Amino acid sequence: MFPPVQDLYRIAPEIVLCLFGMLIMLIDPFIPAGRQRAMGWLAFVGTLGAFASLRWMFMNPGSAYSGLLRADTFSLFVHGIVIAVAALAILGSFDYLDHEGIQRGEYYALILFATAGMGILAGANELVTAFVGLEISSISTYILAGFRRNALKSN
């Protein structure tokens, strides 16, 4: 049985972020090494899509999934901040990744997954949901912290 459409509207930003993250991971192996910056632009478009989907969340306030998540003005505000910061982080990392020679698509996918986890954490109405959001964002952040394998600071 599928959840009601209102529940899907209330988690629309997370759905958009995860779909773009999976799309980047599926497309990335087929992109030539010199064109990896396109994955960053695709991730940026994903953050714009998630930001645009906040409208659906705003139009359908209330709880979702039997009270596990809550879509209200506070979670909408936090979602907006988190998605905007992720978009700025993606834009700011283009030249850095080129300079370090580690321009790979999974970097951008991990940023999108971490952003989705923070969004779940922002809308959590139960402790279990908060833990799931925290784990999704923290695992992605741990992987991002060790992304530069050859640097001593990442080890």
Regions found by a protein language model. Give the residues of each.
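Alpha-helical transmembrane segments of multi-pass membrane proteins predominantly involved
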Residues: 1-155
